[in-house]
Amino acid sequence: MKKAIIASVIALTMGAGVAHAANNANAGTIDLNFSGTVSTTTCALEPEVGGKNGIMGIQLGQTDKNTKGADIEVVFKPTADSATACAAATTDFVMQWDGVGSVFSADGLKASGGAATDSYVLVKATNAKVNNNQQVNADGFQYEFSKDDVISGLKYTMNLMGGAVVGDMTAAAQVKHWYK
């Protein structure tokens, strides 16, 4: 009898667990992306656009079909909290570009959302030691900067390259950075 009661309790518990695990038609989902680095020298950077720091959404403006849009200068500088650590570095600095939800190709960073599906974002460093003035043309593309340029800023020019399809576009990139 004791075994039968225990078996019944286990069966009820398992059944209750299944009921709670069932999908709720009103439930939503949240996708989270996490990234970070572990380093002996921490040098956190933030983008500066139009003289404003910490701009994580870069507005590329409008352009005509099949036309390169205006140059947008983006300068990556140390955050206030890491300026001292960045200045103390003794080696050159690397920035690596990867697409998020899209990929970099010879044409640039392909649109990952919006109606203008054949548009691209063009990205190129303008004060790098290695690959200077070369457009990012593949995931994993790297620029190398002099350690002295980190404090004054790692400079980039970015453009919207319109395709044949009109409309809005979105794209996202992950930029990893470290001292060599």
Outline where the language-model segments fall.
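Gram-negative bacterial Sec-dependent N-terminal signal peptides
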Residues: 1-22
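Mature extracellular/passenger domains of Gram-negative fimbrial/pilin and adhesin proteins
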Residues: 20-180
